[in-house]
Swiss-Prot record:
Protein name from the UniProt record: Chaperone protein DnaK
Family: Belongs to the heat shock protein 70 family.
Annotated keywords: ATP-binding, Chaperone, Nucleotide-binding, Phosphoprotein, Stress response
HAMAP family xrefs: DnaK
Gene name per UniProt: dnaK
InterPro entries: ATPase_NBD, Chaperone_DnaK, Heat_shock_70_CS, HSP70_C_sf, HSP70_peptide-bd_sf, Hsp_70_fam
């Protein structure tokens, strides 16, 4: 059975893993690293993903998209989105359906499309390692993602050519990874997940049931717009203000300078986790009428901690709420697990230790634990692993709007999923012919202060006094945390239901169009790969041909030298164009000229004792002979790098 891979689709970095035997393998990408920057760049009709996109961000800030996860499944009018508009160098726009999209090179893109490029990179990374096509995956999301954000993540997977078998919460995945190697009996753990763009905390019980593990989420809480990006922004704002004081220039008006600042701030933040101070030195950051300006600012760890103190404090209240919802106190928690790159900050670790009263575990890799957990869940779904039972929860209350604009809960937050619950309602007026069902998600008492997930109408209700008709509303939430709602008139049996999608979101037609667009890009990638391979083989043959003519000397006639030189020139000219078939034809033509010459020289050398013999196979399509074997290695390495840069 094909493997189901686990993907941590992160705000800042992404990671992919797979279960092999009884061990999880975190897979290295083409660049040799186990995490890939969640950055996508659009440059000269090419799509760059990961490190190659990050490398060119400074020179292409408006077309380099990062932290796109913060937009997925969100409305343009959301306060969090409006805040981001002033912080990123790329353009965030309002789509026709009201969602937050981005615009690159005059092309409008949904966050799902951009995320799909990252998922395609993860898919390709896994396929290169496994040596087989991958079509199924478990993808992680922040525990506090709402229904629209979860559905949007599944759509991104679909656009990337993946059947998303399960959406799993990131803290839950980390607990799976933690529990796999820790056979320490029953215990309750707190997973504190501070990533690049989101924060979650989950209280999880790991129970040993006759040798099997049951991992049950007791409660979860968080903030989907709080993470390492906000820590970077706090430092960037400080640097901008300091520079403005010194030079009277506002760097926020310069996208190029802002991108350089972002890179420097991220680097400085990381350095300050292990050192007490660092210097940010950016020569020629900008220029005005008086000449070029240079930014040189020393930042201490204490200064950074002062800048982000309120951000760290914001993570503690969700911890308190999660404990309360689980009915536990800090003394009931046996282990605290830190996940997400931002959790490496010493101040964060100190505050978490102060709150829970115990030192966080250091034996969990915060960058890889989530992908490892996703891979374990993938193995459970495929049947490769049978000794783990995962019981997750819905993070937010689900309900409908009733008379007076009140939110009436149907499924309370922290209910174990999958779950199905029903409640009977009635009409608010005499002879009311229909009822409108508006479905909301959130914790506010007034319905419209929560997230509207969707609405529908149940009609043809027989005339009756108010309060008489019996309308049964049922909520059915699956293991992905995605909701289906139905309403049934118990007197007539008439029923109406909807699979909840965001009241915006992508339509099936839009998703299909994006899939076709992605497939078209895949075909372009395949053509580029074929072209690169043909060029590499041609270059190797040209090099071998020139060497052969030189080594054979007077064993080659003048007519043969002329024929070889002409064929080499024609092949070199062909490699400068994009016609694969022409390159292959001219490669074959050069081979046909060389083969009889080298064969003759080889036989003559053999007759003379073979001391200076030539191997005629050295010119057979660039695949045989020791010299070409060495070239093959070079071609493959070079090709992999080029392929990644062109995706």
């Amino acid at each position: 059975m094909a493997k189901i891979i686990g993907i941590d689709l992160g705000t800042t970095n992404s990671c992919v893993a797979v279960l092999e035997g009884d061990k999880v393998k975190v897979i290295e990408n083409a660049e040799g690293t186990r995490t890939t920057p969640s950055i996508v760049a659009y440059k000269d009709s090419e799509i760059l993903v990961g490190q190659s996109a990050k490398r060119q961000a400074v020179t292409n800030p408006k077309n380099t998209l990062f932290a796109i996860k913060r937009l997925i499944g969100r409305r343009y009018e959301d306060q969090a989105v409006q805040k981001d508009i002033g912080l990123v160098p790329y353009k965030i726009i309002k789509a026709d359906n009201g969602d937050a999209w981005v615009e690159v090179n005059d092309k409008k893109l949904a966050p799902q499309q951009v995320s799909a490029e990252i998922l395609k990179k993860m898919k390709k990374t896994a396929e290169d390692y496994l040596g087989e096509t991958v079509t199924e995956a478990v993808i992680t999301v922040p525990a506090y993602f709402n229904d629209a954000q979860r559905q949007a993540t599944k759509d991104a997977g679909r656009i990337a050519g993946l059947d998303v078998k399960r959406i799993i919460n990131e803290p839950t995945a980390a607990a799976l990874a933690f529990g796999m190697d820790k056979k320490e009996g029953d215990r309750k753990v707190a997973v504190y997940d501070l990533g690049g763009g989101t924060f979650d905390v989950s209280i999880i019980e790991i129970a040993d049931l006759d040798g099997d593990q049951q991992i049950e989420v007791l409660s979860t809480n968080g903030d989907t717009f709080l993470g390492g990006e906000d820590f970077d922004t706090a430092l960037i704002d400080y640097l901008v203000e300091e520079f403005k004081k010194e030079q009277s220039v506002n760097l926020k008006n310069d996208p190029l300078a802002l991108q350089r600042l972002k890179e420097a701030a991220e680097k400085a933040k990381i350095e300050l986790s292990s050192s007490s101070s660092t210097e940010i030195n950016l020569p020629y950051i900008t220029a005005d009428a008086t000449g070029p300006k240079h930014l040189v600012i020393n930042v201490t760890r204490a200064k950074l901690e002062g800048l982000v103190a309120d951000l760290v404090a914001r993570t503690i209240e969700p911890c308190r709420i999660a404990l309360k919802d689980a009915g536990l106190s800090t003394s009931d928690i046996s282990d605290v697990i830190l996940v997400g790159g931002q959790s490496r900050m010493p101040m964060v670790q100190q505050k978490v230790q102060e709150f829970f009263g115990k030192e966080p575990r250091k034996d969990v890799n915060p960058d890889e634990a989530v992908a490892i957990g996703a891979a374990i869940q993938g193995a459970v779904l495929s049947g490769d692993k049978t000794d783990v039972l995962l019981l997750d929860v819905t993070p937010l209350t689900l309900g409908i709007e009733t008379m007076g604009g009140v939110l009436t809960p149907i499924i309370e937050k922290n209910t174990t999923i999958p779950a199905k619950k029903s409640q009977v309602f009635s009409t608010a007026a005499d002879n009311q012919p229909a009822v409108d069902i508006s479905v909301y998600q959130g914790e506010r008492k007034m319905a419209q202060q929560n997230k509207l997930l969707g609405n529908f109408q149940l009609g043809d209700i027989p005339p009756a006094p108010r309060g008489v008709p019996q309308i049964e509303v049922s909520f059915d939430i699956n293991a992905d945390g995605i909701l289906k709602v139905s309403a049934k008139d118990k007197s007539t049996g008439k029923e109406q239901s909807i699979q909840i999608k965001a009241n915006s979101g992508l339509s099936d037609a839009e998703i299909e169009a994006m899939i076709k667009d992605a497939e078209a890009n895949a075909e372009e990638d395949r053509k580029f790969e074929e072209l690169a391979k043909a060029r590499n083989e041609a270059d190797a043959l040209v090099s071998s041909s020139n060497k052969a003519v030189k080594d054979l000397g007077d064993k080659v006639t003048e007519d043969e030298k002329t024929a070889i030189t002409t064929a080499v020139s024609e092949l070199e000219a062909a490699t400068k164009e994009n016609d694969v078939e022409d390159i292959k034809a001219k490669t074959e033509a050069l081979q046909n000229i060389l083969m009889p010459i080298t064969q003759r020289a080889y036989e003559q050398a053999q007759g003379a004792g073979g001391a200076q013999g030539f191997d005629p196979n050295a010119f057979q399509g660039g695949d045989a002979g020791q010299q070409q074997k060495a070239d093959d290695g070079v071609v493959d390495a070079e090709f992999t790098e080029v392929k990644d840069d062109k995706k």
